[in-house]
């Protein structure tokens, strides 16, 4: 504190009036000896009387030593009720010094780690959480105690209660806490929210982490944990493009790049999820950027699969399954499969979505090369029924991926986009100007020829 002052619980900053350090140096060893002889209650009364004097005189160092000594003696004597009572009593004393309370709480936090008896540990945690509630100067200790309590609840099978307890903490506002520890707390909040399937809250909590933090040193483990949690979240949301970006972030991590098997699995997931993502400008841009990665050469099947979606040619689903099905779903000894198309409900859904992306790719190709096509012909090219083809086409039109108009009576699809009236008028005006310029030039050339012949 500035000028050697101490801060009281009411916020006032006071200077030390009397130095009791010599008295405390003399009394503490005497009290420790008496406590070991079993006269703990007598010792505590003596120390409480001395604490009043040091507190009134604003001697922060001596007050801290007395508070720590009281809880230490109670702990060593295993007088748990007395320990909890004195923590409450000392923290609530009138005009108590903040630094002294902080020292006492820090000492008690070490006891929480050492105590093995669960009911005693839980009671001490509850007492300390009660004492630290609403006090900024012990907010870090309160956060750590809350995390310990949440861990105990989770170990006892009460995951919902653990998530609820940990969510109370708004650690992103704790300026005194190190950034790394803050991120660890937020990741733990995300993990527990995912465990109880609270996806909306997980999404909100995830926004509290700035991903630029992961560019700092010694953050790779936290980075991988964060992106794995985000993958779980976005898999529930079905946001394939976001999952692809998360896997790219994992793929770009140095510790993943250092191990061939790990980066290959990450890159395979990147390729598969970008293919699974519905087509739009961002997806198309990402596909071409991923295609330029030289490391794709080491997983040729996945490189060829990605190339199919960048080539302006029709694909047959049956051929794709024949060529890539086994590699994507089962893998091989040299190239293990990812869990994207695993034999789970989610894996089957993604396999179905892959088929949908093949169909959508084919319809986009048709829209590029055809101006008009019959429904029957389109269904034949897509290996689908007419109704299924129409459903896919309608979906792409609604999403504004392509333009198409269907004449259902004639069974004809028109891919030609109608021109805007202003553009039509501009085209007409431009062509008319071009025609008049041509007529003018021709007239001029005729007149020139006539003049030359007249001269002759």
Swiss-Prot record:
Sites of N6-acetyllysine modification: 221, 368
Pfam families named among the record's database cross-references: PCI, PSMD12-CSN4_N, RPN5_C
InterPro entries: PCI_dom, PSMD12-CSN4-like_N, PSMD12/CSN4, RPN5_C, WH-like_DNA-bd_sf, WH_DNA-bd_sf
Residue intervals of the PCI domain: 242-420
Domain of life where this protein originates: Eukaryota
GO biological process: proteasome-mediated ubiquitin-dependent protein catabolic process
Oligomeric form and interacting partners: Component of the 19S proteasome regulatory particle complex. The 26S proteasome consists of a 20S core particle (CP) and two 19S regulatory subunits (RP). The regulatory particle is made of a lid composed of 9 subunits including PSMD12, a base containing 6 ATPases and few additional components. Interacts with ERCC6.
Protein name: 26S proteasome non-ATPase regulatory subunit 12
